[in-house]
C-alpha cells in the first residue's frame, strides 16, 4: 500500500487548487476478482494488460460451493421456480445455498412438507446484520431488474458473478430464461461464460462540507469566489465534513425537489469546477447500465454497459438548452444545494435510502472499481440489443414499402 504523508497530502491539495486532475479520465481499472473464487480468464493476447471487453470470460480459481439465491419477494408465482432451483442446487450439484431469512420463513415454504428436507439445509442471513460478502461464490437472481439491483446492494465491495433469470415484469438486465436453468447453470459452473462488467458509482454523502460565512452561504453562484472556475482553498474544509453514507450504486443517483413545490436548485461540480446550476425537478447521475432506466425516461441516450462513462441528465429543467451530457468515467462529480435555493433537496440511490440534503451538504460521485460481473446468455453485444428490442421495443415502426411495390399497386388500381 502507498504510504500517505503530510507532504503527499499537501501536493494533492496544491494540485486540486491549481486545476490539475487527480483522477484518471477513463476511470479506475475494474477489479478482476469477483468474490472468493471467481475471476476473469486471463487473455495472453491482450495488449498492455488492457483486455478487450468482448473477450472477457469467467473462470474459477476453485470449484464454486456457496450459491446465493435472491428471489423477488411477495410474488407467489416465483415460489415453485425457487423451490425447483434450490432442489437442483442442493441435491444434484451439492451446493450450499444461501437465502434471506424472510424467504426461508415464508409461510408457503413452511407448509410444503416435500420441500422440508431442502429447506432445512438452506443457510439464511439478514440484510444489514449478517455479512456474507466473503463466502458467496455465485449469485442467482429470480425476478426482474429490481432483484439484480437489490443483489448489488448487498455487496459494497467485490461482487460475485451474477446470473439473472427473467421472471419479473421488464427484465432488461435478466437475459436468461428459466425453462433451461439446469443447462445454463451447469455451463456457468464449468467456467468460460461471457460476462459484462457493469460499472457502479461510488457515492459519498458529506454533511456540512461547505464552509459558511456567518452561517450564510454566498447569495448566488456568481458571487462564489473562484480561481479559474475552481473552488478556492478555504471554501471547502475536509475536516469539517462528515461522511454519513457511502454506497455502491448500480443504476443511478437521483437528486430531486422532494415534496416541495419550488424548483430544485443545485450546483454541479466536475473535479472541483462549477459547470452548471440545475434548476428544475432535479438531476440524474447514472451509470451506462442506468442509462436505460430513469435517465432514458428523462430523455437521455442509452449507453452500452462497456462504455466507460457517467451520464448526467436533468429532470424537467427550466431551460430549453439543458441537454443530457456524458462525461468520462474517471471524473468526480459533486452536487451541492445552491446558496440561493429556496428549499432543500432529496437524494436516493437506486431508488433506496432516500434522504434530505441541506445547505452545506454535498454528494460526491465517481466510478467505483467494483463492478457487477453480469453473466451473459449469449454475448455482451447480442444481449444488450436483444434487451433493447424485446423490453424497450427500440426503433419499432411499420416497415416502409419498396417503391416498386407502391408503383405496382397504383398501376393495378388504375
Predicted region positions:
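Short glycine-rich anion-binding loops that position phosphate/pyrophosphate groups of nucleotides
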Residues: 73-74, 145-147, 170, 289-291
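N-terminal low-complexity/intrinsically disordered extensions
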Residues: 1-138, 179-250, 255-261, 267-277, ...
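Compact, glycine-rich, soluble single-domain proteins
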Residues: 68, 142, 314-315
Amino acid at each position: 500500500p502507498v504510504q500517505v504523508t503530510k507532504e503527499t497530502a499537501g501536493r494533492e491539495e496544491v494540485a486540486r487548487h491549481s486545476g490539475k486532475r487527480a483522477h484518471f479520465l477513463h476511470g479506475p481499472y475494474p477489479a478482476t476478482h469477483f468474490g472468493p473464487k471467481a475471476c476473469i480468464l486471463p487473455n495472453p493476447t491482450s495488449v498492455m494488460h488492457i483486455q478487450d471487453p468482448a473477450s472477457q470470460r469467467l473462470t474459477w480459481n476453485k470449484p464454486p460451493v456457496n450459491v446465493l439465491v435472491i428471489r423477488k419477494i411477495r410474488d407467489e408465482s416465483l415460489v415453485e421456480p425457487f423451490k425447483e432451483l434450490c432442489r437442483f442446487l442442493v441435491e444434484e450439484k451439492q451446493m450450499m445455498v444461501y437465502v434471506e431469512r424472510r424467504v426461508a420463513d415464508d409461510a408457503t415454504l413452511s407448509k410444503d412438507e416435500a420441500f422440508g428436507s431442502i429447506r432445512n439445509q438452506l443457510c439464511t442471513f439478514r440484510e444489514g446484520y449478517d455479512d456474507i460478502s466473503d463466502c458467496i461464490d455465485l449469485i442467482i437472481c429470480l425476478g426482474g431488474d429490481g432483484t439484480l439491483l437489490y443483489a448489488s446492494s448487498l455487496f459494497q465491495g467485490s461482487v460475485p458473478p451474477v446470473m439473472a433469470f427473467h421472471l419479473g415484469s421488464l427484465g432488461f438486465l435478466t437475459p436468461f430464461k428459466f425453462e433451461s436453468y439446469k443447462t445454463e447453470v451447469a455451463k456457468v459452473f464449468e467456467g468460460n461464460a461471457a460476462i459484462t462488467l457493469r460499472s457502479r458509482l461510488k457515492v459519498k454523502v458529506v454533511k456540512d462540507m461547505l464552509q459558511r460565512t456567518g452561517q450564510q452561504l454566498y447569495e448566488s453562484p456568481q458571487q462564489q469566489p473562484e480561481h479559474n472556475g475552481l473552488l478556492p482553498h478555504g471554501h471547502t474544509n475536509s475536516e469539517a465534513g462528515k461522511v454519513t453514507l457511502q454506497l455502491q450504486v448500480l443504476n443511478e443517483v437521483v437528486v430531486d425537489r422532494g415534496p416541495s413545490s419550488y424548483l430544485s436548485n443545485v450546483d454541479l461540480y466536475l473535479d472541483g469546477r462549477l459547470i452548471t446550476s440545475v434548476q428544475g425537478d432535479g438531476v440524474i447521475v447514472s451509470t451506462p447500465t442506468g442509462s436505460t432506466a430513469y435517465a432514458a425516461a428523462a430523455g437521455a441516450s442509452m449507453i452500452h454497459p462497456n462504455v466507460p462513462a457517467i451520464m448526467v441528465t436533468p429532470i424537467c429543467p427550466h431551460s430549453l438548452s439543458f441537454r443530457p451530457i456524458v462525461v468520462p468515467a474517471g471524473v468526480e462529480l459533486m452536487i451541492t444545494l445552491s446558496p440561493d435555493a429556496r428549499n432543500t433537496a432529496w437524494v436516493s440511490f437506486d431508488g433506496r435510502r432516500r434522504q434530505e440534503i441541506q445547505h452545506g451538504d454535498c454528494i460526491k460521485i465517481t466510478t467505483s472499481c467494483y463492478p457487477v460481473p453480469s453473466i451473459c446468455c449469449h454475448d455482451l453485444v447480442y444481449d444488450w440489443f436483444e434487451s433493447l428490442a424485446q423490453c424497450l421495443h427500440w426503433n419499432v415502426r411499420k416497415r416502409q414499402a419498396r417503391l416498386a411495390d407502391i408503383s405496382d399497386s397504383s398501376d393495378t388500381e388504375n
